[in-house]
Regions:
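A short SAM/SAH-binding and catalytic strip from SAM-dependent methyltransferases
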Residues: 120-132
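C-terminal lobe and adjacent flexible extensions of AdoMet/dcAdoMet transferase-like proteins
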Residues: 208-220
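Class I SAM-dependent methyltransferase SAM/SAH-binding core
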Residues: 43-45, 49-101
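C-terminal alpha-helical "lid/dimerization" subdomain adjacent to the S-adenosyl-L-methionine
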Residues: 151-207
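Conserved class I S-adenosyl-L-methionine
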Residues: 1-35, 51-55, 78, 165-171
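A short glycine-rich, Lys/Arg-flanked "PGG" loop and its adjoining helix->strand segment in the class I
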Residues: 134-146
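Helix-to-beta-strand junctions that scaffold the AdoMet/dcAdoMet cofactor pocket
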Residues: 61, 130-131, 144-145
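A short acidic, Gly/Pro-enriched loop at the edge of an enzyme's catalytic core
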Residues: 99-121
Length: 220
């Protein structure tokens, strides 16, 4: 079973078994690192069931727009229910493979696909799920405006005094489909400026936020 398949295997129980209390702080720090303003447009790549949406909504307000992208129809069904319960009218969901994401995917889902439309791009615990995560990074960031903020939140093996937890972390990531050795935040460190970084839970959770350099090629 491949990593994407493992990600969707327990979709119905995802919110219960995702250990969100452990990983919530990483999400919130990552979203804070985007420096969002009211009215901003945010691309949430690998949005899952929409755990990021409440915090994003607080930052961008009713005048902003969230576009959540996920490959799993089941995850998006749960995200849609979350949106309905909260009455958010400014969240769009797109079912797409992040590794081939482009404006045509957005248009097909009825999303305004103006060139370089996004003020921020967010990856929380999602890139390490993807087989070709560098390509997913390129596709998503190509949809953002110059000087957009980007955040990557992901996982590695616990470090130093927390190494005793490493076997448990490795097993949990394997069951969920994440490659704990991927370290996808390294691409953000190379390709953005003004990088902010945080390390949580004995180094298990890594958070990076940076500003995109101008002139990235857009893929249509």
């Amino acid at each position: 079973m491949g990593r994407p398949a493992r990600y969707t295997r327990f979709t119905g129980l995802y919110d219960l078994i995702s250990m969100e209390p452990i990983y919530r702080t990483g999400r919130r720090l990552g979203i804070g690192g985007l420096d969002l303003r009211p009215g901003d447009r945010v691309l949430d790549v690998g949005c899952g069931t929409g755990w990021n949406f409440p915090t994003l909504e607080q930052a961008i307000g009713e005048g902003g727009h969230i576009v959540g992208v996920d490959l799993s129809a089941q995850m998006l069904e749960q995200a849609a229910r979350r949106i309905g319960r909260q009455g958010w009218g400014n969240v769009s969901l797109v079912r797409a493979n992040a590794e081939t994401l482009d404006r045509s995917n957005l248009k097909t889902s009825g999303v305004d696909a103006a060139p370089r439309a996004f003020d921020a791009v967010l990856f929380t615990y999602s890139l390490s799920l993807m087989t070709d995560w560098p390509r997913a990074w390129r596709q998503a960031t190509a949809l953002a405006r110059d000087q957009a903020r980007v955040t990557v939140v992901d996982m590695q093996l616990p470090q130093a005094g927390a190494r005793w937890f490493a076997p448990v972390a490795r097993l949990a990531c394997a069951l969920g489909g994440s490659d704990i050795m991927a370290h996808p935040w390294t691409v953000l460190e190379r390709e953005t400026a003004d990088v902010k970084e945080w390390s949580l839970r004995g180094g298990h959770i890594q958070v990076r936020a940076g500003t995109l350099a101008p002139g990235k090629e857009e893929r249509t």
